[in-house]
A protein has these predicted regions:
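Proteins that catalyze or organize thiol-disulfide redox chemistry
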Residues: 1-51, 58-92
């Protein structure tokens, strides 16, 4: 299951018991739309093992600024409340 990540709830999910994968995207971003089905499948396949979230950078620019996101899509990986990885661009 995918969750909606916002400025208000990212800390809660980051500090949860499961690792967190966050897809930062925007509605106007073509590459973001290309990877959306992959992110959804990841959420389905690893349900209960990781939390997969989507964060619209237009609505949550504070999240993008905090993690220095300059290009989208960007995927952030968190474990134990810490950022442990970052991937910028569409996955090929």
């Amino acid at each position: 299951m995918e969750v909606k990540i916002t400025t208000e709830n990212i800390e809660e999910y980051k500090n949860g018991s499961l690792p967190l994968v966050v897809d930062l995207w925007a509605t106007w971003c073509g590459p973001c739309r290309m990877i959306a089905p992959i992110v959804s499948k990841l959420a389905e396949e690893y349900d209960g093992k990781i939390v997969v979230g989507k964060c619209d950078v237009e609505e949550n620019d504070d999240v993008a600024a905090e993690y220095r996101v300059r290009n989208i899509p960007t995927i952030l990986f968190f474990k134990g409340g810490e950022l442990v990885g970052k991937h910028v661009g569409a996955i090929t």
